């Protein structure tokens, strides 16, 4: 029988993002997923494929700015496109526009491709696409490229004080 010495073992440190710490603190059950990545973001459909997950459950987090200078967060399935007119209507604005990529970190505290609806610098009004109400789990960024979490949609909606609306293009 072979003897394995502890000092010969390499242990991988489990990554805990701020999003996971928030979920732990709130005692919300979640599953942590990792996918292979470089330093840059990849599109959400690729992320779903890399994790072997149904793209209907994998959502991306997009940040917009309204006419009145307020920021809004929209969370939609990765294979759908945001409808800015529907988004504006859902938050009571005349119009909203996507924030420039260069402003993502300044506004949210996250980088492009690692933006989570949970744990941003400030709590912004958050709207989920209506499909979030009828799926068994939702998968979103854990706040770092290469890391995703899946949890019950109702838990995520509650923690973000979110609402649901039809916010994607037909």
Model-predicted segments: where are they?
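Extended, low-hydrophobicity, polar/charged segments
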Residues: 2-170
């Amino acid at each position: 029988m072979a003897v394995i010495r502890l000092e010969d073992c390499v242990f991988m440190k489990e990554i805990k993002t701020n999003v996971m710490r928030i979920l732990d603190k709130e005692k919300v059950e979640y599953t942590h997923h990792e996918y292979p990545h470089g330093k840059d973001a990849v599109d959400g459909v690729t992320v779903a494929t890399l994790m072997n997950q149904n793209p209907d459950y994998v959502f991306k987090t997009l940040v917009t700015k309204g006419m009145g200078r307020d920021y809004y967060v929209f969370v939609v399935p990765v294979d759908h496109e945001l409808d800015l007119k529907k988004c504006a209507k859902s938050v009571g604005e005349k119009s909203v526009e996507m924030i420039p990529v260069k402003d993502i970190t300044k506004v949210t505290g996250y980088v492009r491709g690692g933006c989570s609806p949970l744990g941003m610098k400030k709590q912004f009004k958050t709207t989920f696409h209506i499909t979030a109400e009828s799926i068994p789990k939702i998968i979103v960024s854990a706040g770092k490229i290469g890391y995703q979490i899946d949890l019950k949609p109702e838990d995520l909606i509650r923690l973000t004080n979110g609402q649901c609306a039809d916010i994607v293009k037909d």
